[in-house]
């Protein structure tokens, strides 16, 4: 993948890199990539799918952090919309399903559905947990009824939090401006990544200080902390985050 030197994170592979690899090795049968990444940066799945199919390869996408994509024009399209042959989504990460719940989506004729089911049967229990399966169906139903509104609420909440955080001196925030470079075609704004290097802390140190003060962040790395915003977050959550930042870091 490409690299963002400002935030110190890997971003996405480009369509050109995919085509170059397929040209070098005609025996490649599948392209596998992660989109979006943990920071909400999505690859150009539509173009990559077209390239993969041109060379006779299937496109498989790890979309663990994007089960909500496709429910709002404010978010990047889902990989299945863009022509991927299969994608795996962690329904429990962002949506309302219970922990451990995920979905595998398959479309088109490039993959054998029966073989996929046979392979899955080797890896899954013959006594599945019906509570987990019921929560998957409940999450699916919730999105079918109000997915658009839920996605819009999450985006609005994240945008508000991002604007408030931008008032603190020295903080750098990842925004939709990252799209268009480093292989990034779209940005999921519900992932609020904050670079804290200017404050003299590593992301890990800042995350621990926030945790001790009662604010749990989704991810920490060398220079950043990431806040995951969902449709259920509201004003009280922002107030708590901002109060802790003012108390601990300013």
Where are these regions (language model features)?
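A generic structural motif
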Residues: 37, 198, 231-235
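Short hydrophobic/aromatic beta-strand micro-patches
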Residues: 105, 195, 228-230
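A generic structural signal for well-ordered coil/turn residues at beta-strand boundaries
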Residues: 98-100, 188-190, 221-223
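PLP-dependent enzyme catalytic core of the Aspartate aminotransferase-like
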Residues: 209-213, 218-250
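Conserved glycine-rich beta-strand-loop-beta hairpin in the small C-terminal domain of fold type I
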Residues: 158-159, 176-193, 225
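Conserved PLP-enzyme active-site core in the AAT-like
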Residues: 1-178
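Short, surface-exposed ligand-recognition loops at beta-strand->loop->(often short) alpha-helix junctions
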Residues: 194-201
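Generic non-transmembrane alpha-helical segments
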Residues: 51-54, 160, 164-168, 205-215, ...
């Amino acid at each position: 993948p490409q690299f963002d030197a400002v935030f110190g994170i890997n971003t996405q592979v480009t369509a050109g890199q995919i085509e170059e690899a397929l040209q070098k090795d005609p025996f490649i049968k599948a392209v596998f990539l992660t989109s979006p990444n943990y920071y909400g940066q999505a690859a150009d799945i539509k173009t990559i799918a077209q390239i993969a199919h041109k060379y006779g390869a299937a496109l498989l996408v790890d979309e663990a952090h994007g089960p909500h994509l496709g429910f709002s024009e404010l978010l990047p399209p889902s990989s299945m919309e863009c022509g991927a042959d299969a994608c795996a989504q962690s329904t429990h990460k962002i949506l309302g399903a219970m922990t451990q719940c995920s979905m595998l989506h398959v479309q088109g004729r490039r993959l054998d559905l029966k073989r996929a089911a046979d392979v899955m049967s080797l890896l899954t229990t013959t006594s599945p947990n019906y509570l987990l399966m019921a929560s998957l169906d409940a999450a699916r139903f919730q999105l079918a009824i109000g997915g658009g509104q839920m996605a819009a609420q999450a985006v609005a909440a994240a945008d508000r939090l991002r604007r408030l955080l931008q008032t603190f001196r020295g903080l750098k925030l990842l925004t939709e401006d990252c799209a268009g470079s480093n292989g990034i075609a779209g940005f999921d704004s519900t992932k609020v990544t904050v670079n804290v290097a200017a404050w003299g802390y590593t992301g890990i140190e800042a995350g621990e200080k926030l945790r001790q003060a009662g604010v749990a962040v989704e991810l920490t790395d060398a220079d950043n902390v990431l806040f995951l915003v969902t449709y259920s977050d509201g004003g009280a959550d922002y107030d708590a985050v901002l109060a802790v930042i003012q108390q601990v870091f300013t």
